[in-house]
Amino acid sequence: DIRKSRTLPSKFYYEEKAFNDSKTAFKGWQFALHSSQFQSNNIHPIEHIESITGEPIVIVKGEQVNCLSNICTHRGMRLIDQPCSKNSFRCEYHGRTFSIDGKFRNMPEFEGVIGFPSDDDNLLNFPMAVWDGLHFTSQDPTSPIPWAEVESRLGFLDIESYVHDPARDRDHSISANWMLYVDNYLEGFHIPFVHPELNQALDYSGYITETFEGGVLQIGKAMEGDVKFAL
């Protein structure tokens, strides 16, 4: 009963412990890139995921698509800074090389070292999942993936045929607790006051937010007679 609902205690928005505890949510499935981005380069560092998980990663396409750690297993040097096309990785610090699937290949001056290399010398390989050309990765493979919900709502769109246009990319840095921003995104009460043009295009009384395991869906209903599609 929504009449009995309450907002979170304010400490969740300003206490450091609460903020750090909330970061576990970031280890779930995150969108990385679209298949069309491999048309120009087969290696892509994914900065937007690093910014929220703290883990530098790179998506590479060889015989298959992998999500690898973007940090050399020797002294922690970043391996890839820009999208590029290569058949292997070579660390610019000490020359350690890795195959395109992240396996250790060679290290100068380490010939004859006993017990070397080991599995620890390979790059970490994180789980990946693909839906209709959209590639996702996770640091917690037990996180639920709501593919059934996504497919039932968006399956009619041929997203795999879409082509990424980097000119349309936008980055925004917001000085706020992430929960404040998500709260704002998930509620529509502010639309008539903050977004008057959007309010004219939407049937505000029909604004819907649906939650399900692993995801949330918002539906803004167009005015009668406007171009629209069904979700």
Regions found by a protein language model. Give the residues of each.
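Short, contiguous pre-domain boundary segments
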Residues: 1-11, 162-163
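Glycine-rich, flexible loop/turn motifs
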Residues: 4, 8, 75, 100-103, ...
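Glycine/alanine-rich phosphate-binding loops at beta-alpha junctions
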Residues: 4-5, 12-52
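Short amphipathic
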Residues: 11, 30-36, 165-175
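A structural signal for well-ordered alpha-helical scaffolds and beta->alpha junctions
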Residues: 15-19, 121, 147, 178
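Generic structural signal for secondary-structure transition and capping sites
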Residues: 27-30, 77, 190
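Rieske [2Fe-2S] iron-sulfur-binding domain
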Residues: 38-141, 151
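C-terminal catalytic domain of Rieske-type non-heme iron oxygenases
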Residues: 58-60, 70, 129, 134-231
